[in-house]
Amino acid sequence: MQKPIKKDPNRYHGEKMTEFSEWFHNILEEAEIIDQRYPVKGMHVWMPHGFMIRKNTLKILRRILDRDHEEVLFPLLVPEDELAKEAIHVKGFEDEVYWVTHGGLSKLQRKLALRPTSETVMYPMFALWVRSHTDLPMRFYQVVNTFRYETKHTRPLIRVREITTFKEAHTIHATASEAEEQVERAVEIYKEFFNSLGIPYLITRRPPWDKFPGSEYTVAFDTLMPDGKTLQIGTVHNLGQTFARTFEIKFETPEGDHEYVHQTCYGLSDRVIASVIAIHGDESGLCLPPDVAAHQVVIVPIIFKKAAEEVMEACRELRSRLEAAGFRVHLDDRDIRAGRKYYEWEMRGVPLRVEIGPRDLEKGAAVISRRDTGEKVTADLQGIEETLRELMKDILENLRTRAWERMESEIREAETLEEASRIVDEKRGIISFMWCGEEECGMDVEEKVRVDILGIQEEGSGTCINCGREAPTGLTLPEHIS
């Protein structure tokens, strides 16, 4: 494939911590994650390298979900009357819906919406599938694209009009307590998933005015980006019986009665990949967790004329061994300078680089370079597979540890409104304080401190920063991407 974007080893990516927007835009292009030149605003093309990262990320998620969920695939189009059935839900999306009004040259009798989310797509079918208490629980998920006419400033992978990687799970239960247990289970699923990516997260219950439309409550996962803004990366919703009543989803109890089911749903999107890129990357480019990287190992031959063929043969043999052992490996045998190869593979975030030259070959060894720390170690070629596996485990642990440390360093406590305001003026990041959870009080805090309330953490107790009533821990932030 001919490269559509010219690589420049002297290109300035931008300082990640101080010029994050420029850095992020440049890395997406330079590392061939996506091509943003598609002629529709807010829509992009996944390039082969980016698509492999996406594929590997979803592989991790599917491995977790497939333990007790079933994967399905529902249509893209939603009839207007079905979308309109749940008024509260629709009100949350009505300004963002794309409509199909014609089939060819003929005007449709009823408009069809491109799904903004899939409750109104899936739940009419659930009403047909659920019959008896013996059918429950049901747990489904799908990975699809969704469309929202985003009117704010679009940002690739973060705020888009086509969400190309929308994972949504929908579950159906006989009782409210079972739905509550599923919410807790969904939170554990996402914790395991984000931990496997090394992504730090805050878990909060969203304030009532910011919950998912039609839900009883929303639990959200947020992470902190390099520019000091938080990014919502996952949500879990307890839907209660709201949608069951709208779409007549009932089951027969053991006693022969008919009752409405209880439901949950939880989703995440392209933002997960954006957070992996943003949080772990550096001024040299991507720095990917091994399970996500398109290539986990790149082999770079150090060629001198005297032993060129012997070195190449050793590299080819090592590639075969590593592939047989389950590694995703690439042998870079291009006839260009080794330094250029180092630059490109560092920029693309390959976790481990293996260098073999004539001297290494004489010793039966290779030099292994870590992308996350830049450290180099010499390892015997015999048994190098185990060395690489141990290094990959250590790389993930290191990425995870330093990401958590950075986020936690940006959380600051405030005991008064004045102190919270001062932190907003002087710092970026997250403010921790006590909030009673009441909407009127929360709105008052937002106005006085000039922040958005992120939500409530269940742990901790004290008195509300505004009204003085007993309160759990609340979190605010100067800027939040929801």
Curated annotation (Swiss-Prot):
Its main location: cytoplasm. GO terms for molecular function: ATP binding; metal ion binding; proline-tRNA ligase activity. It is an enzyme of class 6 (ligase). GO terms for biological process: prolyl-tRNA aminoacylation. SUPFAM superfamilies: C-terminal domain of ProRS, Class II aaRS ABD-related, Class II aaRS and biotin synthetases. Pfam families: HGTP_anticodon, ProRS-C_1, tRNA-synt_2b. L-proline binds at T117, E119, R148, H237. Transmembrane segments: none annotated. Belongs to the class-II aminoacyl-tRNA synthetase family. ProS type 3 subfamily. Catalyzes the attachment of proline to tRNA(Pro) in a two-step reaction: proline is first activated by ATP to form Pro-AMP and then transferred to the acceptor end of tRNA(Pro). Can inadvertently accommodate and process cysteine. Homodimer. The dimer is functionally asymmetric: only one of the two active sites at a time is able to form prolyl-adenylate, and only one tRNA molecule binds per dimer. Interacts with LeuRS, which enhances tRNA(Pro) aminoacylation. HAMAP family: Pro_tRNA_synth_type3. This is Proline--tRNA ligase. The lineage of its organism: Archaea, Methanobacteriati, Methanobacteriota, Methanomada group, Methanobacteria.
